A protein has these predicted regions:
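C-terminal edge and immediately downstream basic/flexible tail or linker adjoining helix-turn-helix-like DNA-binding
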Residues: 3-5, 81-83, 89, 130, ...
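C-terminal flanking helix
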Residues: 17, 39, 107, 111, ...
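DNA-recognition helix of helix-turn-helix
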Residues: 64, 68, 131-155
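Arg/Lys-rich amphipathic alpha helix in sigma70-family domain 2
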Residues: 48-50, 61-80, 144
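A short, charge-rich alpha-helical start-of-domain segment used by transcription regulators
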Residues: 1-18, 32, 43
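Sigma70-family region 2
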Residues: 37-54, 74-75
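Internal acidic/polar
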Residues: 69, 76-103, 123, 161
Length: 161
């Protein structure tokens, strides 16, 4: 099963961009490059996939790896400000904006797991498959990420008072 690349672009482009943007630490251009490179790799990939879910997991895994490679790259020096990207986003409440800002400041290993769990609706088993981690490791990262997020938000809200 290998659906047309255009169909998958329409279906997964925004999700892959969000993941790549998260890993690339707020750099729009790098995130766009990751998404484009991911779909190019899919288009040239010779093997067939069993299910749509297998394709989705493969795309996410490739995007994560490409984004990590970019952030490790020697040439990855200039980054866009969070403020530049924030101008393109709309939030329903000020709290949503604060939450997004705080999640973006978390260490990568927590940020990715939280994003996949809460924004992409993956189960812990699916996340463990995508990231090649044990289910217990995913649960631990979710728990520690939530605790760190809660602690950081408490500090920010106490500072506002």
């Amino acid at each position: 099963m290998k659906p047309a690349t255009q169909v998958l672009i329409e279906r997964y482009q925004k999700h892959l961009y969000a993941i790549a943007f998260n890993i690339c630490r707020n750099n729009q251009q790098d995130a766009e490059d990751v998404v484009q490179d991911t779909f190019i790799q899919y288009h040239t990939y010779k093997k067939e996939f069993d299910t749509e879910e297998h394709i989705r997991a493969w795309l996410i895994r490739v995007a994560i790896n490409k984004a990590k490679n970019i952030t490790r790259s020697f040439w990855h020096r200039n980054k866009c400000n969070l403020e530049e990207y924030m101008e393109t986003l709309t939030f329903e409440t000020p709290e949503s904006e604060t939450l997004f800002d705080t999640v973006m400041k978390l260490p990568e290993k927590y940020r990715i797991v939280l994003h996949l769990f809460y924004y992409e609706d993956y189960t812990t088993q699916e996340i463990s498959d995508i990231l090649h981690l044990s289910v217990n490791n995913v649960k631990t990262r979710l728990s520690r990420g939530r605790a760190l997020l809660k602690e950081t938000l408490k500090e920010e809200w106490n500072d506002d008072e």
